[in-house]
Amino acid sequence: MAALLRAVRRFRGKAVWERPLHGLWCCSGQEDPKRWVGSSSPISKEKLPNAETEKFWMFYRFDAIRTFGFLSRLKLAQTALTVVALPPGYYLYSQGLLTLNTVCLMSGISGFALTMLCWMSYFLRRLVGILYLNESGTMLRVAHLNFWGWRQDTYCPMADVIPLTETKDRPQEMFVRIQRYSGKQTFYVTLRYGRILDRERFTQVFGVHQMLK
């Protein structure tokens, strides 16, 4: 996984995995706050109260997330092709045009592809691409991938986010968990390969940590 993370960093774009959110201002603390941050990829998001007037500030970004989204969609297409090929394979076997070994091989490849798809989807749907904090400091917006490899935004009240200082995760680890007191979905942040754009807001969300020293 570390080698894959190092490889995908080479494919970072100038504006990676960012997009307008239907009237929601989004700006990264180091860029022009009046500039829309956007992309053409489909997006799914939960409804946020006062979304039309709320302003969010980016404080963390993992540039390689767009590449992982592409890999996720590629894996989904590859799995679909292997599964779709099974019925014709069984038919050809029934007609004596394929051997049993060939059909077993096709079934094995399809099963392996489905297993890998489930594993990749489970991990990638929890890998954080961008973190935002609203201006009032009460809402954390987590941009991550959905099952189809497109961006999805999840909103977490700050009161529900467990600071890193209260967890057993170490900053030297490849992935650090974003956990919630409510026990809802856990996300993963890679501090080794991601970038903290605003340390003040990062500390506000996750607490003072030795990685910021």
UniProtKB/Swiss-Prot annotation:
Subcellular location: Mitochondrion inner membrane
Membrane topology of the entry: Multi-pass membrane protein
Subunit structure as annotated in this protein's UniProt entry: Part of the mitochondrial complex I assembly/MCIA complex that comprises at least the core subunits TMEM126B, NDUFAF1, ECSIT and ACAD9 and complement subunits such as COA1 and TMEM186. Interacts with MT-ND3.
Pfam family, one: TMEM70
Stretch forming the signal peptide: none
One Gene Ontology cellular component annotation held by this UniProt entry: mitochondrial inner membrane
PANTHER family cross-referenced by the UniProt entry: TRANSMEMBRANE PROTEIN 186
Top-level taxon of the source organism: Eukaryota
Membrane topology, Mitochondrial intermembrane segments: 101-102
InterPro entries assigned to the protein according to its UniProt record, in alphabetical order: Tmem186, TMEM70/TMEM186/TMEM223
Similarity comment: Belongs to the TMEM186 family.
Keywords: Membrane, Mitochondrion, Mitochondrion inner membrane, Transmembrane, Transmembrane helix
Gene: TMEM186
Name this polypeptide is given: Transmembrane protein 186
Transmembrane segments: 80-100, 103-123
Function: As part of the MCIA complex, required for efficient assembly of the mitochondrial complex I.
Alphabetical GO biological process terms: mitochondrial respiratory chain complex I assembly
Mitochondrial matrix side: 1-79, 124-213
